């Protein structure tokens, strides 16, 4: 009862128990000023530092060893031992055995291994014929999408989408693509470089030791300054024209040069240097590190060598052109210090700056750590931790300072700068180390500091690019924290962030521990090779285009004289001239040559006459040349230049009178027919001037006779002797008669001739087959009557001949003449045989099918029918005296019919083959005629 009362009377103890059972919640630390700690140890403190045995037992628990012996238990095991494999290689031989006749043969397959591309998951270019683009296009067109998916086509040059944006299934063990910054696969090039440099140094040392000369004076190093001398010469050459008038050294005043003649040659343009477009001087030097590595740190020429750069004239020129050379070229000290240093991995660095002066930190901590300074001076003492809160922030101390100044909170105590440099899409990292070297646990947190952004309006999205663990935490005494910062950006640019490392208790009197993150993301140039190739092609195309335009401009400026056209009548033959002068006659070479000889004969006979030149003599020549239309006024002047003025007037008057009489004679109709030539010329006379073609025959020299029969006749009519004139007219009329007849073509219709010959062969073979059958079957032979038909080739009627020359009307007359001839033949047959059909009626429809050119055959057929009708064969009148078996005759008829069908079939086949061959040859000839 007493215990219960006491429990009721003590509620505070119950509350304390409940609070003890509840989980302790962390309370934020309250910023309080630390109480002054005395440095003098009290008695209780000394006793607390004493080491007790109980504490040692807790740290190290003793382990007692067992002294008793354990019984030994033995067991037996059976182990299977395998025989060693035979190390010798087995040789396999293939033996071919004859297959059984029942074995099924498989078709040969030349497609090669089918799984050649399934292992890699795509078709390679060397596995197919042609390009992958065409193969994929054909597969898609045929609907084979499964095969089209196996074809992977590289992006073309103009594709702007990078390969990284396309999601592609990567194989599990595929190696990552090396970075463009990585060194080439020749990973031993640095080793080779060092090995060659070591050999070079050994060679230098051996030569200098053997020759007793320094390494810089060796002959192998004399060419090191050659590039520098050449550059200095170029600078002096460019500076000289500015010092003087420049006419002697400048090409501005020089005239343009000709390659060849000034009229037909080419004008050479000036170069870029002559026009003042000088390219900048290219400086090539060795960096100091390379000079040290090659063993030439201080190269100096020997004092006894009088080189180009030691000449007095050069020294004078340098002083004279010093100001101009300084403007043209920059200082050589700038290029000597240039050096390219790089590596193949993304770059990251850590830079630390301490902004607070160290005097202030030492003054604030000197009062509390006086005894520690004396201890640190002793080398044999172990460094002791700093009492109180303290951090090593990236190696820089950040201690707790007694008292705080509000102005220090605005300043930066320690600034750490983390720099990242990588390609877009690549990740790089850097570490920040913080060590708690004090005796107090320090609570920390990260706060982002705002910074002024001048391009805030241009930024569209705020994407996180820096990644690290920015949660708050506690650093215990002696603990080291590593903060890893990562940077990754999908686009190129320069990015920056600032963070503040806050601590509790506050260090450095409230000064900021700032971490600046600065990153540069570079663009990956994946199309560099393609771009260079495209630039090369465009440059070549541009050069070709410029050259073509320049050539076209040059060709437009060059004017060549036009080629003199050939005269229209340059290729006229004698036959063309004859047909033009005599349109109603037909040219025959032999007859025309005879007329030429006749003309020459009478001309010589006329020239041999020793008569005084009369006024009448030049009239025929004038008429001949005037009628021909080929004489020019210049020839007329030369023809009559020898005549006197009085004779010229008489000649002109008589010529005019002769033309008037000629026109009047042409207008009248002559009743008596003297010759065919005169009738043709009279009909042609009125239209002679109208039908004359406009082209004149100037280029061809006029012949002695102008090939005009009218002019020939007029010249003959002027002969004084009547016998000579009559003889010439007779020969002229005879020639005209021959020229009126059209010459037969040398080659007639080949198809007609071949068909006729084939038909004759068929008839001959039919007759021979009939005779053979009659002889075989024992039938009597038929009596054959042979008629000797006279050759009627020369018997041609004038209407038939006229039908070849004339057109429409002549054709109608020909038809009428043919009808009259048939009518006459029919009346003759009616008189001989009244009751039978006349052969004229039978031949009337066949005569229409015949060609108009084959007049010979028309006459022959008519005469043959007439003879057959007059003398019928004896077979048609008298029957056979011997009796013939009807069965044998029927068999003979059937065999003969079968033979006729076979012969006709062969005839049709041969005709079709020959017709096709002739049509092909005609087409070839027509094409050749068109080409010519």
Curated annotation (Swiss-Prot):
Task: Please give the biological process terms from Gene Ontology that the record holds.
Answer: cell differentiation; chemical synaptic transmission; spermatogenesis
Q: Where is the composition biased (Polar residues)?
A: 795-806
Q: Which residues, renumbered to this chain, carry the PTM Phosphoserine?
A: 559, 566
Region described as Disordered: 1-39, 165-187, 789-886
Q: Name one Pfam family in it.
A: MYCBPAP
List every position bearing Phosphothreonine.
560
User: Which GO CC annotations does the UniProt entry carry?
Assistant: cytoplasm; membrane; synapse
Q: Where found? A: Cytoplasm; Membrane
The reply to whether Membrane figures as a keyword in the UniProt entry is yes
Name the keywords, alphabetized. Cytoplasm, Developmental protein, Differentiation, Membrane, Phosphoprotein, Spermatogenesis
> Basic and acidic residues bias located where?
165-178, 810-869
Q: How does this protein assemble?
A: Interacts with MYCBP.
Biological role: May play a role in spermatogenesis. May be involved in synaptic processes.
| Protein name listed in UniProt | MYCBP-associated protein
**Gene name in the database record:** Mycbpap
């Amino acid at each position: 009862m007493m215990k219960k009362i006491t429990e009721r009377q003590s509620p505070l103890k119950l509350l304390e128990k409940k609070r003890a059972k509840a989980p302790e919640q962390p309370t934020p630390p309250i910023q309080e000023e630390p109480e002054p700690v005395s440095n003098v140890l009290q008695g209780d403190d000394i006793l607390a530092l004493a080491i007790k045995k109980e504490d040692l037992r807790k740290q190290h628990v003793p382990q007692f060893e067992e002294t008793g012996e354990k019984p030994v238990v033995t067991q037996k095991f059976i182990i299977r031992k395998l025989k060693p494999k035979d190390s010798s290689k087995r040789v396999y031989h293939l033996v071919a055995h004859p297959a059984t006749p029942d074995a099924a043969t498989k078709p040969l397959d030349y497609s090669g291994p089918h799984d050649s591309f399934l292992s890699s998951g795509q078709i390679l270019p060397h596995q197919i014929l042609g390009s992958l683009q065409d193969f994929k296009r054909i597969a898609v067109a045929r609907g084979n999408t499964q095969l089209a998916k196996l074809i992977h086509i590289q992006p073309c040059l103009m594709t702007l989408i990078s390969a990284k944006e396309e999601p592609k299934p990567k194989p599990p063990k595929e190696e990552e693509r090396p970075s463009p910054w990585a060194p080439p696969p020749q990973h031993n090039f640095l080793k080779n470089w060092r090995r060659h440099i070591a050999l070079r140094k050994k060679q230098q040392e051996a030569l200098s030791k053997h020759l007793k000369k320094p390494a810089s004076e060796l002959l192998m190093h004399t060419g090191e300054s050659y590039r520098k001398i050449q550059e200095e010469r170029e600078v002096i050459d460019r500076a000289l024209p500015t010092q003087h008038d420049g006419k002697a050294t400048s090409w501005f005043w020089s005239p343009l040069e000709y390659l060849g003649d000034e009229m037909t040659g080419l004008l050479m343009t000036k170069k870029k240097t002559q026009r003042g477009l000088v390219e900048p001087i290219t400086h090539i030097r060795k960096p100091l590190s390379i000079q040290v590595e090659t063993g030439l740190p201080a190269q100096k020429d020997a004092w006894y060598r009088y080189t180009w750069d030691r000449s007095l004239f050069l020294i004078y020129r340098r002083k004279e052109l010093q100001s101009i050379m300084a403007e043209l070229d920059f200082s050589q000290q700038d290029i000597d210090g240039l050096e390219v240093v790089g590596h193949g991995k993304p770059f990251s660095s850590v830079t630390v700056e301490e902004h607070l002066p160290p005097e202030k930190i030492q003054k604030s901590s000197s009062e509390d750590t006086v005894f520690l300074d004396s201890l640190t001076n002793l080398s044999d003492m172990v460094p002791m931790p700093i009492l109180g809160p303290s951090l090593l922030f990236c190696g820089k101390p950040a201690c707790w300072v007694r008292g705080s100044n509000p102005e220090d909170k605005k300043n930066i105590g320690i600034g750490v700068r983390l720099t990242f440099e990588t390609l877009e899409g690549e990740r790089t990292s850097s570490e920040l180390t913080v060590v708690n070297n004090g005796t107090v646990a320090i609570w920390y947190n990260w706060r982002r500091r705002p910074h002024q952004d001048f391009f805030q309006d241009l930024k569209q999205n705020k994407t996180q690019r820096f990644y690290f663990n920015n949660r708050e935490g506690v650093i215990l005494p002696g603990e080291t924290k590593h903060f890893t910062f990562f940077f990754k950006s999908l686009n190129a640019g320069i990015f920056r962030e600032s963070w503040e490392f806050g601590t509790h208790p506050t260090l450095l009197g409230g000064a900021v521990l700032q971490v600046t993150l600065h990153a540069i993301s570079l663009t990956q140039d994946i199309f560099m090779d393609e771009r260079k190739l495209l630039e090369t092609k465009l440059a070549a195309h541009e050069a070709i285009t410029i050259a073509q335009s320049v050539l076209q401009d040059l060709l437009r400026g060059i004017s060549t004289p036009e080629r003199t056209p050939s005269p229209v009548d340059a290729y006229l033959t004698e036959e063309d001239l004859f047909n033009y002068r005599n349109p109603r006659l037909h040219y025959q070479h032999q007859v025309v040559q005879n007329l030429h000889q006749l003309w020459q004969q009478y001309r010589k006979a006329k020239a041999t006459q020793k008569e005084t030149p009369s006024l009448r003599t030049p009239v025929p020549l004038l008429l001949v040349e005037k009628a021909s239309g080929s004489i020019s006024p210049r020839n007329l002047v030369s023809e009559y230049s020898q005549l006197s003025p009085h004779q010229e007037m008489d000649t002109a008057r008589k010529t005019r009178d002769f033309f008037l009489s000629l026109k009047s004679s042409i207008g009248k109709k002559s009743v008596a027919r003297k010759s065919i030539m005169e009738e043709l010329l009279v009909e042609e006379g009125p239209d002679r001037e109208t039908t004359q073609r406009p082209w004149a025959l100037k280029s061809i020299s006029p012949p002695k006779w102008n090939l005009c029969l009218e002019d020939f006749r007029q010249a003959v009519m002027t002969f004084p002797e009547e016998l000579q004139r009559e003889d010439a007219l007779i020969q002229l009329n005879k020639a005209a008669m021959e020229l009126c007849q059209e010459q037969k073509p040398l080659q007639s219709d080949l198809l007609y001739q071949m068909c006729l010959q084939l038909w004759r062969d068929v008839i001959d073979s039919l007759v021979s087959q009939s005779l053979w059958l009659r002889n075989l079957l024992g039938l009597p032979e038929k009596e054959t009557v042979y008629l000797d038909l006279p050759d009627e080739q020369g018997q041609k009627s004038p209407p038939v001949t006229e039908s070849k020359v004339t057109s429409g009307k002549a054709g109608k007359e020909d038809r009428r003449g043919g009808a009259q001839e048939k009518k006459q033949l029919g009346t003759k047959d009616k008189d001989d045989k009244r009751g039978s059909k006349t052969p004229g009626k039978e031949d009337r429809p066949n005569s229409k099918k015949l060609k108009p050119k084959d007049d010979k055959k028309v006459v022959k057929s008519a005469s043959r029918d007439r003879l057959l009708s007059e003398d019928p064969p004896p077979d048609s009148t008298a029957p056979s005296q011997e009796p013939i078996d009807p069965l044998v005759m029927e068999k003979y008829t059937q065999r003969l019919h079968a033979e006729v069908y076979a012969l006709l079939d062969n005839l049709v086949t041969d005709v079709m083959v020959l017709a096709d061959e002739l049509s092909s040859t005609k087409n070839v000839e027509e094409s050749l005629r068109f080409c010519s």
